[in-house]
Amino acid sequence: DYLYTLLVPDRASTVFPCFDQPDLKAAFNLTLEIPKEWVAVANAPLGKIIESDTSTVYVFEKTKPVSTYLFAFACGKFKVASQPTRYGEMAIYYRDNDSAKVNRNIEAIYELHTQSLGWMENYTAIPYPFSKLDIVLIPDFQYNGMEHPGAIYYRESSILLEGDPSENKLLNRANLIAHEVSHQWFGDLVTMRWFNDVWLKEVFAGLMADKIVNPQFPEFNHQLSFLLSHYPRAYSVDRTAGANPIRQELDNLLNAGSLYGDIIYHKAPIALMQLEMAMGVSAFQEGLRKYLNTYSMGNASWDELIDILDPLTSLNL
C-alpha cells in the first residue's frame, strides 16, 4: 500500500521517455492520480489537489532543473508530520506505527535537518537552492539515504531510532542527515556531467557532513575515527591487483553500479582531505563557493573543479 521511485543511475526511462544521463537536466511537471486514502510527495511543492469519488489527483508545481536520476515521487498510506521552519513547511512521511518512537525522534529529525541546511548555506554562501524540503522514511529502503532534491528518502530504521540510542547511533544518524542535506548542493545543485565523476558528489557530501556534525559530538576523537574508518578499507583494496583509480571511465551507464565501493567511499575522502590541508581551509572554501556558483543548476567535471581551485594555490594542481 505504498510505492516510491528510485531511478539512480539509469531508470528514469522506465517511468517516462527520456535520455537518461545526468548532464541533460530538465524542469518536470508531475501529476499523480492515486487512491483516495493515499498521500503523495515529490521533488516540487504541491500545486493543487483534485478530489473525485474514487481517487485523488495531486498536481505538483514545476521542479527546478534536475537530472533524471534525481526525479522522485512517493505515495501510499504514509502518516505525515509537519512543522514550520525557516525553509518553509517541512513534512515527514513515515510508516512506523509506534507513535511513542516517532514522538521521541521527531524533534531531533527536524533540528538535524535545519542545522545542516543552515551550516551549508553559511559555508557555501548559497541559500537552499530548491523550493522545499520534505523527508520520506521508507521501511527496508535499499540505501541509508537518497538525496532527491526537495524530497530526501531515508531507510526508516536509520532515522527513527529505537529506545535509548547510543552516542554512536546518534552520531551516525546526524552524519547521514548531514550527508544527504549536503548533496542538495553537491550533486543536486551542481551535478557531475557523467557518472565517471560520481565519486565527486559522494566525497564532498561526506566531507561536509563531517564538518557539520563533528563539533556536535566533542566526546569523540573524530580524527582517530576518520583514520580507523577510512584507511584500513582504502588500503585493503588499493594494495590489491584489482585496485582502480578514484575516477574511473564509464562507457555504459548500465555499469554505473560498479563504480561504488571502498575506493570512492574510503580512499577518495583521504585524498580530498589532503587537498584541503594542502590548499588551506579558506582557499579551499573559496574555490568550492566559486565552483557552486559557476555551475549552479548545471553540471561540472573534476577537471572543471580543478580549473577553479588551481589559481587559488601555489600548488600545481
Residue ranges of model-derived segments:
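Acidic/His-enriched low-complexity segments
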Residues: 1-131, 260-262, 277-279, 295, ...
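Hydrophobic alpha-helical and helix-loop surface patches within well-folded domains
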Residues: 60, 92-317
